[in-house]
């Protein structure tokens, strides 16, 4: 089903449910979507990174193990991937992860402005049919929302192996007055399931590093 109660056009659908024991574990890592609870979390953390659509959680695990001082919030509606990540963080006793399994845009809207150091959007659904393009996660409205939430020194990392979507992403970033981007490989990153699939199928992967437009120092690094 698509999340029809959201003000956003649905960009995903859910096809499964968690087993009761896994659902119980998820409660320990779930973030509450209210401005008050999110502001409390933000005020208690030095650094916050957010991944929108974390899949099986490969990138999240890699990042939190290498950056133990940050809080990583992952958003993923597909519960099979959520279950796999929960298993891994329980085995490895990881404490600096929180999860959200509904529409990421509803959660991000409640973040204080200038509070997130980094956003990851890795291989979002390209919705390749022209009639479905309106369902694409990345558009000017959503990018403007992210621009409000990232720190002045923050970055948005986007990856896609769908060339039409890449051109769409570039076009929509250019429509955001507060954002600028360059195409460049990520230096701190691990291959995800969809990246490995792209390499196997010999599809070019395009990486976007997006910064607030007056953060020239970051863009020059």
Swiss-Prot record:
Keywords: Methyltransferase, S-adenosyl-L-methionine, Transferase, tRNA processing. The active site is at 125. It catalyses: guanosine(46) in tRNA + S-adenosyl-L-methionine = N(7)-methylguanosine(46) in tRNA + S-adenosyl-L-homocysteine. It comes from the Bacteria. It is an enzyme of class 2 (transferase). Pathway: tRNA modification; N(7)-methylguanine-tRNA biosynthesis. Signal peptide: none annotated. S-adenosyl-L-methionine binds at residues 51, 76, 103, 125. One of its GO terms (cellular component) is tRNA methyltransferase complex. PANTHER family: 3-DEOXY-D-MANNO-OCTULOSONIC-ACID TRANSFERASE/TRNA GUANINE-N 7 - -METHYLTRANSFERASE (PTHR23417), PENTACOTRIPEPTIDE-REPEAT REGION OF PRORP DOMAIN-CONTAINING PROTEIN (PTHR23417:SF14). Catalyzes the formation of N(7)-methylguanine at position 46 (m7G46) in tRNA. Belongs to the class I-like SAM-binding methyltransferase superfamily. TrmB family. This is tRNA (guanine-N(7)-)-methyltransferase.
């Amino acid at each position: 089903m698509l999340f029809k109660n959201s003000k956003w056009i649905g960009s995903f659908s859910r096809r499964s449910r968690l087993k009761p024991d896994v659902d119980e574990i998820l409660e320990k890592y779930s973030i509450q979507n209210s401005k008050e609870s999110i502001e409390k979390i933000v005020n208690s953390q030095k650094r916050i990174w957010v991944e929108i659509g974390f899949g099986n959680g490969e990138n999240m695990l890699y990042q939190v193990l290498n950056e133990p001082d940050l809080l990583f919030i992952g958003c993923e509606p597909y519960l099979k991937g959520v279950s796999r990540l929960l298993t891994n963080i329980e085995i490895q006793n990881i404490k600096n992860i929180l999860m959200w399994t509904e529409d990421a845009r509803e959660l991000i809207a409640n973040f204080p402005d200038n509070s997130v150091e980094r956003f990851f959007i890795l291989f979002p659904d390209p919705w390749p049919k022209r009639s479905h393009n309106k369902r694409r996660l990345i558009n000017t409205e959503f990018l403007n929302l992210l621009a409000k939430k990232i720190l002045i020194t923050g970055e948005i990392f986007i990856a896609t192996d769908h060339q039409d979507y890449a051109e769409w992403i570039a076009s929509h970033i250019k429509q955001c007055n507060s954002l600028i981007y360059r195409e460049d490989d990520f230096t701190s990153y691990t291959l995800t399931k969809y990246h490995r699939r792209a390499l196997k199928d010999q599809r070019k992967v395009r990486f976007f590093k997006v910064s607030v437009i007056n953060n020239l120092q970051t863009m020059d690094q």
